[in-house]
Regions:
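A conserved structural/catalytic subdomain of Rossmann-like adenosyl-cofactor enzymes
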Residues: 1-250
Length: 250
């Protein structure tokens, strides 16, 4: 679902009406998937955190389906430049009871293949080797029921800084640098208000807002740079014999 998020020409009625085509796409899959059916759905980030109807749809997903795995994909692997995407892996109902339509999700496993990874594209192709660590920890069971343990430190994950977030509260420092972690349905409900935008590693290229100067200091610095640039431009115009034009701009 990579068209515009909002749009018209939605011809069917959903349980949670919305003009967001991406959220309608998710509802369509949840409703039409046969009991016991499996899905792996690529969605943009906003599907994981959008409020209102988005929250309702995620609750429906975790209620009616066993959402067992989320793969956070790196940027640059789709045509839309810079789009951030994820893969949701889920089964309609549960393996024990495919017709179950309540409380189907217990634990959600998340693999972060995005943080501190290159931006992929023609010059840096995304290859099978980049997915190999995820395939290993996912296991052979297609329903996500293979024995799993937290902890996977490929692509220099152990060198990553840990974000100051809910995801890292009461978590071992070494475990917090893993790309592969488990979060309970209850934690998602209480700590994230049913947002599935779950991340815990700190991107080395990100800017720490806490270390930035106060807004008035930033504004003063910006103004000083603008005044200096205008002065240099004024001097250049006069050197070029355009003093009258420079005076007219004052």
């Amino acid at each position: 679902p990579f068209g515009s998020a909002a749009g018209t020409n939605i011809t069917r009625t959903f349980v949670h009406p919305t003009s967001n085509k991406q959220l309608c796409f998710m509802q369509h899959i949840i409703e039409t998937l046969h009991p016991g059916g499996r899905a792996a759905v690529v969605v943009p980030d906003n599907v994981l955190f959008e409020g209102g109807k988005g929250t309702d749809i995620r609750r429906d997903l975790m209620d009616k389906c066993h959402l067992h795995t989320i793969l956070r994909l790196p940027t640059g692997i789709f045509y839309a430049q810079g789009v951030k995407t994820n893969v949701l892996f889920f089964t309609k109902g549960t393996v024990a009871n495919p017709h179950q339509d309540k409380n189907c999700t217990d634990d959600v496993w998340v693999y972060d293949l995005r943080t501190n990874m290159p931006s992929f594209g023609k010059r840096t192709p995304f290859t099978e080797q980049h997915l190999q660590p995820f395939e290993t920890v996912y296991g052979e069971d297609p329903h996500g029921l293979s024995p799993r343990e937290e902890g996977e430190w490929s692509f220099n994950a152990e060198e990553s800084e840990v974000a100051d977030s809910e995801e890292n509260k009461n978590t071992d420092q070494h475990q917090a640098t893993s790309r592969w972690r488990k979060f309970s349905r209850e934690w998602i409900r209480s700590a994230k208000s049913d947002s599935l935008d779950i991340s815990w590693l700190k991107d080395k290229d990100s800017i720490d807002a806490d270390s930035l100067p106060e807004p008035d200091v930033l504004a003063a610095e910006a103004m000083g740079e603008l005044v200096q640039a205008l002065g240099e431009l004024d001097a250049l115009m006069r050197e070029l014999g355009a003093g009258d034009e420079a005076d007219a701009q004052r």
